Amino acid sequence: MAEFNIDELLKNVLEDPSTEISEETLKQLYQRTNPYKQFKNDSRVAFCSFTNLREQYIRRLIMTSFIGYVFKALQEWMPSYSKPTHTTKTLLSELITLVDTLKQETNDVPSESVVNTILSIADSCKTQTQKSKEAKTTIDSFLREHFVFDPNLHAQSAYTCASTCADTNVDTCASTCASTCASTCASTCASTCASTCASTGASTCADTNVDTCASTCADTNVDTCASTCADTNVDTCASTCADTNVNTCASMCADTNVDTCASTCANTCASTEYTDLADPERIPLHIMQKTLNVPNELQADIDAITQTPQGYRAAAHILQNIELHQSIKHMLENPRAFKPILFNTKITRYLSQHIPPQDTFYKWNYYIEDNYEELRAATESIYPEKPDLEFAFIIYDVVDSSNQQKVDEFYYKYKDQIFSEVSSIQLGNWTLLGSFKANRERYNYFNQNNEIIKRILDRHEEDLKIGKEILRNTIYHKKAKNIQETGPDAPGLSIYNSTFHTDSGIKGLLSFKELKNLEKASGNIKKAREYDFIDDCEEKIKQLLSKENLTPDEESELIKTKKQLNNALEMLNVPDDTIRVDMWVNNNNKLEKEILYTKAEL
C-alpha cells in the first residue's frame, strides 16, 4: 500500500473539489487521522453497562465549592439599591463639621438646623441598614431553599455520612474516630477522670498539676478512645451516627476544640493536679502565679502571657525550643503568609456547615441532561478545553480468563499496535478499569473488598431511582399552586403542547389523570389524591365486574374495593383542617355509624 502526502492531497482537493478519492486513499487517510487503532470486527457481541463516577464526583466537588463561595459572598456583600447618601467617609466628615458648629454655638441648646441635620443623617443610615438586612434575608432564603437541606422542603439530604458509617467496618470506624473526634475524646476523659484519680491515689492527685490534667487527657487518650470505639459494637455505633442530627454534629465539631474540653476536664478534677508528660520541666501555671516577682517593665507582657493556660503553654514551649525562635520571628514579621496555611481548617469547617439537599443535584443533573447538546456547543465555543469527561471504549477480544497463557499471548501480540493501556474486564461483574500491567492486582484487591464497589454503585443506582420521583413531586406541587392561583389550563393548551412540545423533558412525569384531577380539585392536593384513589377503585371494580365468574378471592376483593370507594367518596367532604373520626353507636341492638369531626393541629 503506497504512502501518500496529506498536504498534496489537500491541495488537489482545494484546487478541484470534484476530484474523486479512491476508497483505499480514504481508508489510509482515516487511519492516519484516527488516533485509535481498529481490529477486525467480530460476530460476537458483548453487553456491558458503564457509569461515569468520576464525572459525578467532579459535579459534586463543583457544587460544594460553589455553595461555600456563594454563602461567603453573601456575608460580605452590602447591597446598593441606589448610591447611598452618606458613606462612612462623608458621614465622618459631616459629623466633624457638626461638632465644630456646636463648639461655636453660644447657647447651651444647639440650633434647630444642627439637630435636623443629625437626625437626617441618622435616618439615612438607618434606611440603608434596613434595606441591607432585607436584601440579605431575601437572598439567604433563596440560598437555603436550594443549598441547605430542610426536611420540610426537600426529600433527601446530600450528606451521606450516616449511611457510610452504618456500612463501614470496625477498623475504618476506629481510624475515623481517632482522627476526627479529639474533642469527643477529651470530653470522655473529663467524665472518667474522677475514677482515674481514685485509682491513681489521693497522694498522687495532690502532687499533680490541675492545668496539665486536661492537656494530658486530651493528648494521650485519643488512641485509647479510638481502640474503645473499635471494640464497641459496630451496629450501635452506626445507629448512633445515623440518628445524630448532622447539622448539630457539624456545628459541635466546628465549635468545640481540645482546649475547651481540656478546661472542662480541669474543672471536673478541681481537687487534683496532673503532670504534663509532654513538658515535665514546666512550672505549673497556678504555682508560678503565686511566686511571680516581675519587674515593672515586664508586668504587662507577663500578665498577657499568663492570662490563659493556652498562652502560657505556647510561650513556655517556644522558650524551651530554640530552633523555633527564628521561624516564629519570620511568622510575626509576615503573618499574612502564615495565617492561611495554619488556619486553613476554618475553611473546611465553614463549608461543612452548609449541606445541600439531594434535590439540588437532581435538578442540576436534569437541566444538564435536557440541554446537553446546547451546553456542549456553548462550552466548546467559550472555553478552549475539550470535553474530557466522556469515555469511549473498544472490545478487542474475549478469552478464557482461567487460561493465563492466552491472556499473556494477546498482550504481547498487540502491545506494539495499541497506544492506550489495556484493561481486563470479567463478564458479568462490575470492574474498576485500570492499566493492564497493574489490573490483575487491582482486580484481586477490589474483589477482596468488593463491598466498597457495591456501596458506590448501589448509591448511584438509588440516586437515579428517586431522582425522577423527586422531580415529579416538585412539578405536581407547582402545578397545583398554579391551578389555585390562575385556574385550569386553557382548552387548547394540551393540543398545543402535544404539537410543539413533543421533546419536552417533563413530558410524561404527570399523567393525564393526575392533571385532570388537579383541575377538578381546583389545585387542592388532598382532594386530588382522593380523586386519583377513586379512579383506581372504579377501574378495579370495572375490571372485576367484566369477568363472568369470579373466584372467592376476587369476590372478596370486589367487596373490599367497593367499601374503599365509598369511604373515599365520604373523605371528599372532610375539610382540610379537620380529622374525621368514625364512631359506632348501639341503637336498639343495632350498630350504626356516626361521623365526628375534630379540628386538626396544623
From Swiss-Prot:
Subcellular locations according to the entry: Host cytoplasm
Sequence repeat residue intervals: 161-164, 165-168, 169-172, 173-176, 177-180, 181-184, 185-188, 189-192, 193-196, 197-200, 201-204, 205-208, 209-212, 213-216, 217-220, 221-224, 225-228, 229-232, 233-236, 237-240, 241-244, 245-248, 249-252, 253-256, 257-260, 261-264, 265-268, 269-272
Repeat found in the keyword field: yes
GO cellular component: host cell cytoplasm
Region (28 X 4 AA tandem repeats of [CNG]-[AV]-[DNS]-[MT]) location: 161-272
Main location: host cell
Keyword list, A-Z: Host cytoplasm, Late protein, Repeat
The keyword Repeat is annotated on this UniProt entry: yes
Upregulating conditions: Expressed in the late phase of the viral replicative cycle.
Family: Belongs to the asfivirus B602L family.
Functional summary from the UniProt entry: Plays an essential role in the assembly of the icosahedral capsid of the virus. Allows the assembly of 3 molecules of hexon protein p72 and formation of a thermostable trimer.
Protein name as it appears in the record: Protein B602L
Organism: African swine fever virus (strain Badajoz 1971 Vero-adapted) (Ba71V)
